[in-house]
Amino acid sequence: MIDLMPKKNTFLLKKKYKEDSNNSVINDLFDFFGKEFCFHQITLTGFPIIWIDKTLLIEVGKFLYHLSQPYIMLYDLHGVDERIRLHREDLPKADFSVFYHLISIERNSDIMIKVPLLENDLILPTFTGLFPNANWYERETWDMFGIIFNNHPNLTRIIMPSTWKGHPLRKNYSARATEYEPFFLNEQKEDLEMEGLKFKPELWGMKRKNDNVEFMFLNLGPNHPSAHGAFRIVLQLDGENIVDCVPDIGYHHRGAEKMAERQSWHSYIPYTDRIEYLGGCVNELPYVLAVEKLANISVPEKAEVIRVMMSELFRINSHLLYISTFIQDVGCMTPVFFAFTDRQKIYDLIEAITGARMHPAWFRIGGVANDLPQGWNILLKEFLDWMPKRLKYYINTALKNSILIHRSKGIAEYNKKEALQWGVTGAGLRATGLNFDVRKWRPYSGYQNYTFEVPVGSGISDCYSRVMIKVEEIYQSLFILKQCLCNMPSGPFKSEDSLTTPPSKECVLQNIETMITHFLQVSWGPVIPENESFQMIEATKGINSYYLISDGGTMSYRTRIRTPSFPHLQQIPSVIRGSLISDLIVYLGSIDFVMSDVDR
């Protein structure tokens, strides 16, 4: 058993615990399991982090799951290589750690459970008995760190190819290709890779036949148009009926979390745009907010309003593509061409403000890159006058079509309990009747100052209800944009804090000290104090978040990117078993995902 109480700064730790003793769940844990078996880490995440020994993991999970106000959703699960982390004297001894991020809907609060591990004992019990969505998260943690989860139903690689060697998020695994031998794919290696892609049903617990039927196995993807990206689903079929299926991801993996370890806090911003490549500035927001927490930077009001305005423009842009491609998947072509015309109007506005279109990389640590250009309000007003009438066209000509309704209502249904079990967020969760929208429940960037409604469904999430939720969300985003237009404050667009990156040019030209700071922050990167922070936002496809660990350097020690599309695809088999292939196509169109968001 690992000693959870660090030897240094014991007085400080007791003082910190006393300051946070009003948190009832911490008291409940300490009372039930004993203070000597739990260590409370104080961070800037905004929720308690409790370190426990791995022998208590399942019991602690059950305890939190069965509280009167339970922690019902496993939001995230991943690992950290602690071996070269600086300034961790106040933490339990660990070579690696695994964290379990849980959410209580009734409390509207989170808790993170951390388990320290030594390098010679990287074994944990699986969490899949409590939370079925732990399956993929544990597979990815093994894939990236080599941590074994006992009794996992299928602990195999999920992001990297089955032939891959090593665990990429370990600190001794180089992030640069120049440190490896040049890649060469000879015929023998190519055969090996092709063999690795062959689907073997027995490895997934599937039978090739039963007493009466010999099943057919069909590859849908990884380049099928209805797969919406480089994504493969292997279907076990009895005729047209889906007996079971296995989603296969990882084809779009780019090592986004690894890249964060070799980019400065500032230079990583362009990479965030490409996590969910349709979201643009929406992707930048949780990252810069998390860095600002670490740096203790307060953002000017004008910058907050600009960030909200840009986020809602990209939300509408993404939703329009989703709605039109959903209609196309059901069989209607025309709306997708109209949608691209409407999205062009949004891109014209975004380009006028940021100078770029899909990936502006425009938010900054402490604000935004530039002030709004002259005439931005005219372009925005023209769009606000145009879009509501256009949205009615989509509804009346396509979404009220009896064939579309028949093909999507009652298809791929799940309820609130099932959604929470699988970590579903966004429109899929709200269609079950739960109005969990981070902008309302946990406001950020000034969203508490805006008037808007959260569209919800009647209790069952199906393909039709999910798409109609998105339609209503466009109306609400238009209402938020109108408030931004009418109430845009004056003042600076960037904080004057010394850690704001880059510093304002006006200050740089005034004194040599600011010039030196500017030079260091642009060339070397800002030095962010050691701590941990977390920020979730309501992104275009659900909840997106960044969990950052700084050890006092110019680069992140660990960047964990939790995206909504990853759990949404994991849920597919539980929803679609017993349905037809044609139903799967409609279901995939109703999820709203892109593979860059899944694979990172």
Swiss-Prot record:
The EC number(s) attached to this protein equal 7.1.1.-
- Spell out the Gene3D superfamilies in the cross-references: Cytochrome-c3 Hydrogenase, chain B, NADH:ubiquinone oxidoreductase, 30kDa subunit
Keyword Cell membrane among record annotations: yes
What would you give as a GO molecular function for this chain, any one?
A: NAD binding
Please give the residue ranges the record annotates as the region NADH dehydrogenase I subunit C.
1-190
Record membrane topology: Peripheral membrane protein
Which top EC class is given? translocase
Q: Which reaction does it catalyse?
A: a quinone + NADH + 5 H(+)(in) = a quinol + NAD(+) + 4 H(+)(out)
Q: In which compartments does the protein localize?
A: Cell membrane
Assembly and interactions?
NDH-1 is composed of 13 different subunits. Subunits NuoB, CD, E, F, and G constitute the peripheral sector of the complex.
Q: Which family does it belong to?
A: In the N-terminal section; belongs to the complex I 30 kDa subunit family.
* PANTHER family membership: NADH-QUINONE OXIDOREDUCTASE SUBUNIT C_D, NADH-UBIQUINONE OXIDOREDUCTASE 49 KDA SUBUNIT
Recorded protein name is NADH-quinone oxidoreductase subunit C/D
